[in-house]
Amino acid sequence: MDPNTVSSFQDILLRMSKMQLESSSEDLNGMITQFESLKLYRDSLGEAVMRMGDLHSLQNRNEKWREQLGQKFEEIRWLIEEVRHKLKITENSFEQITFMQALHLLLEVEQEIRTFSFQLI
């Protein structure tokens, strides 16, 4: 994984964990959990691409990996919409910066996962 992406994930997760949104901390905790899950999934796809022979073991281990890939893209789209919504309603500049960075990271990770998945297909 690109060191910049790792630090971006860590920075955003740290910032989000410090935020107290007016709406609900449960919403934010859910977003943080999904960000962490997305990071792990992205890492595993990247590692599979690095080990070219891993495609067969990936397919053998889990025949539904394409379905999982589709679910991850749905999660990314949902997270993008949630982040955009939070960005629109927040007036706190710290939160705005955090959500802008999170949105940028989500779009970047979506593109990376697409690239990895095309290499695996």
Swiss-Prot record:
Record Gene3D superfamilies: 1.10.287.230
Xref: InterPro entries: Flu_NS2 (IPR000968)
Keywords for this protein: Host nucleus, Host-virus interaction, Transport, Virion
Biological process terms in GO annotation: exit of virus from host cell nucleus through nuclear pore
Intracellular or extracellular location(s): Virion; Host nucleus
Pfam families linked: Flu_NS2
Family classification: Belongs to the influenza viruses NEP family.
Note: Average number present in a viral particle is estimated to be 130-200 molecules.
Role according to the record: Mediates the nuclear export of encapsidated genomic RNAs (ribonucleoproteins, RNPs). Acts as an adapter between viral RNPs complexes and the nuclear export machinery of the cell. Possesses no intrinsic RNA-binding activity, but includes a C-terminal M1-binding domain. This domain is believed to allow recognition of RNPs bound to the protein M1.
Protein name: Nuclear export protein
Organism encoding this protein: Influenza A virus (strain A/Leningrad/1/1954 H1N1)
